[in-house]
C-alpha cells in the first residue's frame, strides 16, 4: 500500500471513475484537484466543496505542479501538457493502478476487443456459485476502487486498453486477452500496433496468460509470465477447443469432452468461444468443473449482444448495440441463420475505423443497409446495392418497418460508438428495443 499524504494530486475526468478516485484520496487524507474539459461533467454535484475543480479545459499550471496525475479512461495521453508532465518526472496513472497497489486478494484480469463483459460475468458467476466472495469491476460500469476494503477473496476485472495504458503494477494470477481487432483508432495515432501493445500490457507479471489460439495478436510476446494456456476452435493449436462429434459440437479441455454445446441456452459460435475462455479461467482457480459447466448451460447472454428482442409476423428484430467495432458486426452477421433479407443498421462514431472489411458480406448475404449518425455517409460507400442514409436510427427503423416481410431479420449492429447521438450503447439498444416492439 502507498502513502499519498503530502502528494499534490490532480485527477482528470469527473465521470464515475474520476469520482471514485476523488473519494479514494479523500479517504486517505489527501485533497485532490479535479480537471474536466466538459463544462458540466456528470459527477460535479457529488464533489465535496473542499475539492477544487477546473472545468472546460486543461489547467496546465495545476498539472505541471502536481506530483501525481490520475487520468480517467479515454483521456489522451499524447496531450502536450501530459507529455510535458512526463518529461518533468510527474507520475501519470489510472484507477486500475491505484487499485492494484492496494488490493490484497488474487486478481483475474480480462481484456479484448469483444466479449470481455460476457466472459467476466461468466467467470464471476462460476466463482460465486462455488462459494467465493468475489468483487467484479473495471470496464463494466462499476469503478474498481469501490471494491477496496470489502474482504473479497477474489477480484475479477474487465480492463479496457485505455485503463491498461496507465497500469504498471498489475500482477494477475490469470490474465486473458480474448481477441484483438481494430478499435479506438481515434485514440491511438499509432494504429492497430499501438492498440495491440496496450492490450499486451495485461500479461505483464501475470502468473498464467490465457490467449486465443486463433488470434496471433493475443500471444504474449514481450512481458514476463509463468505459464500460458490457449483456447480456440482448432484442437491442433489449443488446450481448450471445440470439436464436432457424433452430430454435436463439444467443448473439449485437454482432450477431455466436457460439454455438449447443445445443452447451452445460447447456441452460436460467439458464445462457444466465450465459454472456452471462461472455462479455462475457472479451471485455473480450481472452481469445480460441475459448477462451471452448470453456469455455461444456464447462461442466457447479456443485454445488447445479439439479443433477439422481438419477433412478429415472421420478422426477427435483433439488438446488437454493443457491436461498437467492425469485427463485432462481422461476427454478428456470420452467426445469423438467414432465410430472408437482412436489414442491417450501421452508424454512429466509427472512431476512424476501416470499414472496408464489411464489403465481402455483400457477396455472401442479401443485405439491405441503413446508415445513420456521424459516419453514416461514409458507410454508404461500402458498395451495397441497397443502401439508405438517414439522420437517426429511428428514421431507419421506420423505413425498415415499411419494407420488411416474413423471414426477414432486422439487425442493429452498428460497428460504431454510440456517443455521437446517445448517452451509451445501452441507451441506443433500449431505444431500438422500444421502437421495435411498437411496430405491428
From Swiss-Prot:
Binding site for ATP: 112-118
Organism of this sequence: Blochmanniella pennsylvanica (strain BPEN)
Main function: Cell wall formation. Catalyzes the addition of glutamate to the nucleotide precursor UDP-N-acetylmuramoyl-L-alanine (UMA).
Protein name: UDP-N-acetylmuramoylalanine--D-glutamate ligase
Family, similarity comment: Belongs to the MurCDEF family.
InterPro entries hit by this protein: Mur-like_cat_sf, Mur_ligase_C, Mur_ligase_C_dom_sf, Mur_ligase_cen, MurD
Residue pairs linked by disulfide bridges in the UniProt entry: none
UniProt lineage: Bacteria, Pseudomonadati, Pseudomonadota, Gammaproteobacteria, Enterobacterales
Pathway: Cell wall biogenesis; peptidoglycan biosynthesis
Location in the cell: Cytoplasm
EC code(s) of this entry: 6.3.2.9
Catalytic activity entry: UDP-N-acetyl-alpha-D-muramoyl-L-alanine + D-glutamate + ATP = UDP-N-acetyl-alpha-D-muramoyl-L-alanyl-D-glutamate + ADP + phosphate + H(+)
Amino acid at each position: 500500500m502507498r502513502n499519498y499524504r503530502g502528494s499534490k494530486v490532480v485527477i482528470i475526468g469527473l465521470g464515475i471513475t474520476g469520482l471514485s478516485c476523488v473519494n479514494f484520496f479523500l479517504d486517505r487524507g489527501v485533497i485532490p484537484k479535479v480537471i474536466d474539459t466538459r463544462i458540466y461533467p456528470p459527477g460535479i454535484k457529488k464533489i465535496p466543496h473542499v475539492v477544487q475543480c477546473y472545468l472546460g479545459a486543461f489547467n496546465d499550471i495545476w498539472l505541471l505542479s502536481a506530483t501525481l496525475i490520475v487520468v480517467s479512461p479515454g483521456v489522451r495521453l499524447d496531450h502536450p501538457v501530459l507529455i510535458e508532465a512526463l518529461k518533468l518526472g510527474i507520475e501519470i496513472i489510472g484507477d486500475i493502478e491505484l487499485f492494484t497497489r492496494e488490493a490484497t486478494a488474487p486478481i483475474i484480469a480480462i481484456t479484448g476487443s469483444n466479449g470481455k463483459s460476457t466472459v467476466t460475468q461468466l467467470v464471476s458467476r462460476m466463482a460465486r456459485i462455488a462459494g467465493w466472495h468475489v468483487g467484479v469491476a473495471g470496464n463494466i460500469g462499476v469503478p474498481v476502487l469501490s471494491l477496496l476494503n470489502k474482504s473479497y477473496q477474489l477480484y475479477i476485472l474487465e480492463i479496457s486498453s485505455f485503463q491498461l495504458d496507465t497500469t504498471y503494477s498489475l500482477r494477475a494470477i490469470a490474465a486473458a486477452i480474448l481477441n484483438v481487432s481494430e478499435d479506438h483508432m481515434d485514440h491511438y495515432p499509432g494504429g492497430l500496433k499501438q492498440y495491440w501493445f496496450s492490450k499486451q500490457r495485461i500479461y505483464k507479471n501475470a502468473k498464467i496468460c490465457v490467449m486465443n489460439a486463433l488470434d496471433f495478436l493475443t500471444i504474449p510476446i514481450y512481458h514476463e509470465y509463468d505459464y500460458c494456456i490457449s483456447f480456440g476452435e482448432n484442437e491442433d493449436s489449443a488446450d481448450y477447443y471445440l470439436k464436432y462429434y457424433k452430430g454435436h459440437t463439444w467443448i473439449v479441455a485437454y482432450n477431455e469432452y466436457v460439454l455438449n454445446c447443445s445443452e447451452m441456452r445460447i447456441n452460436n459460435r460467439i458464445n462457444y468461444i466465450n465459454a472456452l475462455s471462461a472455462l479455462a479461467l475457472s479451471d485455473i482457480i480450481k472452481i469445480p468443473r460441475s459448477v462451471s459447466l452448470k453456469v455455461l448451460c444456464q447462461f442466457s447472454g447479456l443485454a445488447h449482444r445479439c439479443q433477439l428482442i422481438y419477433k412478429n409476423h415472421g420478422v426477427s428484430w435483433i439488438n446488437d448495440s454493443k457491436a461498437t467495432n467492425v469485427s463485432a458486426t462481422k461476427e454478428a452477421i456470420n452467426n445469423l441463420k438467414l432465410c430472408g433479407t437482412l436489414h442491417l443498421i450501421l452508424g454512429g462514431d466509427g472512431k476512424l475505423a476501416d470499414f472496408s472489411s464489411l464489403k465481402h458480406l455483400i457477396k455472401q448475404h442479401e443485405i439491405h443497409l441503413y446508415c445513420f449518425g456521424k459516419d453514416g455517409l461514409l458507410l454508404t460507400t461500402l458498395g451495397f446495392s441497397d443502401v439508405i442514409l438517414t439522420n437517426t436510427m429511428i428514421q431507419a427503423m421506420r423505413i425498415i418497418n415499411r419494407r420488411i416481410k416474413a423471414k426477414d431479420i432486422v439487425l442493429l449492429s452498428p460497428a460504431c460508438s454510440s456517443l455521437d447521438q446517445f448517452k451509451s450503447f445501452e441507451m441506443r439498444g433500449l431505444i431500438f428495443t422500444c421502437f421495435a416492439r411498437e411496430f405491428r
